[in-house]
Amino acid sequence: MGAKPEGKKTPLTPSRAALDAIAVTLLCIFLLPLLASYASVTATLAVTHNAFVLWPYLLHPWHPSAGPHDRDQAIEAFWVSAWMFYNLVVIPGGLAVFILITFLPLVFLGSLGPLATLLHRVWLTTAASYCVWAYLIDDSVNRGGVASPTLRRLGLWSRIASYFDMKILVEGEEGEGEEGPRGGHGSRIFCYHPHGIIFWGVIAGFASWHWKEVRLQSRTLQSCDVRLGTISFNNLVPVFREVNKNIGSFTVSWNSCLRALERGLNILIIPGGARESMDAFPGTMNVRIRSRRGFVRLALARGASLVPVLSFGESDMYNLLKMKPGSLAFRVQRVYQSLFGFTVPLFWGKTLWGMPTIMPLRRPIRVVIGKPIQVVST
């Protein structure tokens, strides 16, 4: 028997469409604060839990029961949770304090004492000077970042890489006389797939000194430093932008990428973007590339080589709630993506103290760097 033809979808009535729009709006308003609270609370829980686990090893480093393997695992887990705590608690909290200290005294300006008024004026001058420098003068986040060697050498990064048993494999390194990813002599665009939930492979592999070690051991990547493209939101938060730009991060816009390539820099982008995180189900590698052609046009504009990068295990860090396309939750995610440039997938990692948290599962990551695809400038 032949398959029955699918029926046409019934169009929504005006009243149903209005109710649907109201539901999406309410979810957009309330879901993001709820998810942000969940992320902050569970990040705090994770760093507290890992600190308690690590503490006995610090007190009794030579105790027979404190083996080096267990001690290293405890340190690695602590630094992973500390990095998440910094991003999800310290940065938002610091931004809130920055805003309160700047604007709240203006409400009580008449009742402030002379010393408080003086201190507030000093703070306003300092904050205004920083904002002028950061957002009007300093343009490094729009032309490839800075990449401070000191920041990249921090032991934090090597511990995060060890937590995921991070390994970067370069195609062609095992062969004799092969060109490998060196390709031509121009700039390269490293195209990283998949995005995953938090792209731990990029953080552990390319934003750290781990990438320098890979280059030193490679025949084909010794002179190939990489700058990391990220959404503009990450370069707007005061102070946080300084950390970002000094690990080689820059705003991944068309003009910023062009300027970075014009400086002769190699850049890493994630063509699938935040939309790819919606498909980061464990045990899968869902890549969105057919509809993403901007990176190809970018390579054509500058004559840069395209270097494919695949991260195996990137989607295994978290459990992800599957959302049906067209559902309210799915549409809310699309609204967030259009407004902020990122999505807020419903996910969870390790369960600590009976609560699912944002702490990633300890899963191995293997990043494979392929040979470059030569592109002729048009």
Where are the language model's segments positioned?
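Non-catalytic C-terminal accessory region of glycerolipid acyltransferases
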Residues: 2-29, 259-378
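Cytosol/nucleoplasm-facing, intrinsically disordered, low-complexity tails
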Residues: 1-6, 178-182
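Interhelical loop segments of eukaryotic multi-pass membrane proteins
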Residues: 4-6, 51-72, 141-151
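Low-complexity, charge- and small-residue-enriched intrinsically disordered regions
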Residues: 45-65, 166-167, 339-350, 354-356
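Catalytic core of membrane glycerolipid acyltransferases/transacylases, capturing the structured
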Residues: 125-155, 182-263, 273-291, 331
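Alpha-helical bilayer-embedded segments of polytopic membrane proteins, i.e.
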Residues: 9-59, 70-133
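Pocket-edge structural micro-motifs
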Residues: 170-172, 192-194, 230, 271, ...
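A short, well-structured juxtamembrane/interface segment
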Residues: 156-186, 251
